[in-house]
């Protein structure tokens, strides 16, 4: 199965994530706390917590911070009660946006999200206005040059749903959300190290943006990601920023 080129987008995303690394710990602590509250403190039986712990390890979060977040979630330590919220809307060129938040103040969060949309050329929509265009799935990206047949065999044996070869030669392994961490671990054990991966909401129909429109859309995404209550921003936009 073939896919479009996304190598440049991956590199661009990584550069932006590195620039925002100061906020990553705060978001991870929130996610670990909520995951532990919803499904318990054992990552073996809690896929959401396992994913959050994978991300914490990738970002070198101190183990004490991780354990405190788990303890707050399970009630062993007193902590803030976060509410999960999802907002949907439209960006430049009608590109779809989904914004996931964890907050202790819904009124503040919706005001901040609406302001970010309005100030940057977008529109906050109603519940369900773009959700139909997204599917919840995990993905792992491998550099061009990896033996496609061998990787496909290992991935499918590990429980992956699909393997996609992109136009630029990179290979993408698609998983069910709860299987992502297990597939990643199995492939690493087989000698396949991914260069990018996550559990995401992926747009089924994408919106290509270039020039000023791409720059404006990036500004809107950045404004949303910079909000303290925002955990993740998903979009149908494919940005050609070169």
Curated annotation (Swiss-Prot):
- Look up and give the organism this protein is from: Neisseria meningitidis serogroup B (strain ATCC BAA-335 / MC58)
Q: Which GO terms describe its molecular function?
A: DNA binding
UniProt cross-references to Gene3D superfamilies, sorted A to Z = 1.10.10.200, 3.30.70.980
Protein name, UniProt field? Probable transcriptional regulatory protein NMB1648
- Keyword DNA-binding on this protein? yes
> Family per UniProt?
Belongs to the TACO1 family.
Q: Name one GO cellular component term.
A: cytosol
The organism's taxonomic lineage, starting at the top: Bacteria, Pseudomonadati, Pseudomonadota, Betaproteobacteria, Neisseriales
Output the SUPFAM superfamilies linked to this UniProt entry: YebC-like
